Design a protein with these regions (language model features):
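Loop-helix junctions at membrane interfaces
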Residues: 3-8, 12-221
Length: 221
């Protein structure tokens, strides 16, 4: 909770000294929705801190316990949780929450392996891209545009995070073959493509349900 409060206060202090205070009211609202997400922009300071703390804790739990191994394939729900985090608390706070979640999860069950910072970076970028796309593009109340934005999130995070960051990093460190051969092996033989499909399917299924839970007052369009 203390970390979440510190992060929130840092942004507030930065805003007071920056261009935010020279914006029109409408632009201020759009800026708040982009940075804090549409959900947090409509809530008070205490609610903002609570949401950030809860989602950071969820990221930690996802990295500690939501990982499953079947033969040579490792499944996890971190992509889904990271995307949900970025959408609900915004791209910047989402990035920080997901990066911290990966770090704490590693410390919990490192089992003697070295820390791989690119994994935390990729999860942070999943939240960053998801937050920007879902909160930055106005859906104008059109349900079909909501799903178009989700599809863009899935494609971009797959290409940027799974392929460009994680696969490239593992290839540089461990692979003895060409990049494209390793990419095919990692996606299909090691099952990373199916891990992505499961996480993205969960995003399409659960996000619309979460947005309809009235007590949470989550704004996604």
């Amino acid at each position: 909770m203390y970390e979440a409060k510190w992060i929130y206060q840092a942004f507030a202090d930065l805003s007071k000294g920056g261009f935010y205070y020279f914006m029109s009211t409408d632009r201020r609202q759009r800026w708040k929705e982009l940075v804090f997400s549409k959900t947090l922009a409509r809530k008070g300071k205490a609610h903002k801190i609570a949401y950030i703390a809860v989602m950071t804790a969820l990221c930690v739990v996802a990295n500690m316990f939501f990982e499953f191994k079947f033969m040579d394939t490792q499944f996890s729900l971190t992509i889904f949780v990271s995307a949900l985090t970025g959408i609900l608390i915004g791209p910047l706070f989402g990035f920080i929450a997901c990066f911290l979640g990966d770090l704490v999860g590693f410390l919990y069950h490192s089992a003697g392996f070295m820390y791989m910072p690119w994994i935390g970076l990729s999860m942070g970028i999943v939240a960053l891209l998801s937050g920007f796309i879902m909160n930055g593009i106005n859906g104008n109340g059109k349900p079909w545009l909501f799903y178009v934005k989700l599809a863009i999130v899935c494609v971009l995070t797959f290409l940027v995070c799974t392929v460009a960051i994680n696969t490239t990093a593992f290839w540089l460190l461990y692979a003895k073959v060409g990049y494209w051969e390793y990419l095919i092996v990692r996606l299909f033989a090691q099952g990373q493509i199916w891990n992505n499909v499961v996480n993205y399917a969960l995003l399409f299924l659960i996000l619309p349900i979460v947005s309809k839970i009235k007590p949470l007052k989550i704004y996604i369009n």
